[in-house]
Design a protein with these regions (language model features):
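Extracellular/periplasmic ectodomains of large secreted or surface enzymes and adhesion receptors
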Residues: 7, 39-40, 48-51, 60-102
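C-terminal, low-complexity/hydrophilic appendages and adjacent surface loops
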Residues: 1-30, 36-39, 68
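Cytosolic regulatory/linker segments at or just downstream of nucleotide-handling modules
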Residues: 54-56
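Short coil turns that connect the paired helices of HEAT/ARM alpha-solenoid repeats
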Residues: 104-110, 139-145, 170-177, 205-217
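Amphipathic alpha-helical scaffolding segments comprising HEAT/armadillo-like alpha-solenoid repeats
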Residues: 93-105, 125-139, 159-171, 192-208
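Structural detector for internal amphipathic alpha-helices that build alpha-solenoid repeat scaffolds
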Residues: 77-94, 110-126, 145-159, 177-194, ...
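Non-transmembrane alpha-helical segments in soluble domains
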Residues: 16, 25-29, 42-49, 101, ...
Length: 229
């Protein structure tokens, strides 16, 4: 059914004819006759990101304590390198692994994050099936967004116990919702639900005892995960 599309994984690129399909239900990106249109729009977007020095690919906590616009210019942040990595991460193939592996070791958190995203996409698409140690090590990254994305990725690479345990138990309580967000994505995948079920008691306790009034309260998120299971 059409409504289900919102809750299913999407490719990095989708193309819609908004005149004929205003609800964006029919993706045209894989249809050969639209290949030229897709290429032109991809290039236009790529150019726009670079022309505007888009900061939308930075992690939410990268904006704390300073003005990000000023920081990236003062420190001469390698924005072009970041943009290239982001574009690769969404459409990664095994040929992209050297770039992704390099990103995992970067001192810049955004590079590590998008490197992990690339691995996660490869893993979910079954293009790779072994978990590199560098990726597993990022479960302990000091940045909760990186640790959460790494946990999501390793679940698809034979490390379900380690990954889900990391999402269930944050390093700091204030970061619980970040892990739950990734866990909710996993719970929407029927093939992942059996790996999550051993943690039902922890999720039930969270659903009963954590705040659950606002939309993104951890208790409410735990309830949503339980419903998916």
């Amino acid at each position: 059914p059409d409504w289900k599309q919102t809750f299913e994984p999407h490719p990095a690129e989708m193309l819609f004819d908004l005149e004929k399909d205003p609800d964006e239900l029919h993706d045209l990106s894989a249809i050969p006759e639209y290949a030229e249109t897709l290429y032109k729009m991809r290039q236009a977007l790529s150019d726009h990101i670079r022309t505007t020095h888009d900061l939308g690919f930075f992690l939410p906590n990268s904006r704390t304590g300073h003005i990000l616009y000023e920081k990236v210019r003062k420190e001469k942040y390698p924005l072009d390198e970041l943009y290239g990595l982001v574009e690769i991460a969404g459409t990664a193939t095994v040929a992209s692994l050297p770039m992704l592996e390099k990103a995992l070791a970067s001192p810049l958190p955004e590079m590590r994050f998008w490197g992990v995203v690339g691995y996660a996409n490869l893993a979910r698409e079954n293009q790779i099936n072994t978990c590199p140690q560098a990726l597993l090590a990022l479960l302990q990254d000091e940045n909760p967004y990186i640790a959460s994305e790494a946990a999501y990725a390793v679940v698809y690479l034979g490390k379900a116990q380690e990954g889900i345990a990391r999402l269930i138990t944050p390093a700091q309580e204030k970061d619980r919702k970040i892990g739950y967000s990734s866990l909710e994505c996993l719970s929407l995948d029927p093939e992942m639900r059996d790996y999550i079920r051993p943690f039902l008691s922890e999720l039930k306790e969270a659903a009963e005892n954590l705040p659950r009034l606002a939309n993104e309260d951890a208790g409410l998120m735990a309830r949503g995960i339980l419903v998916n299971l």
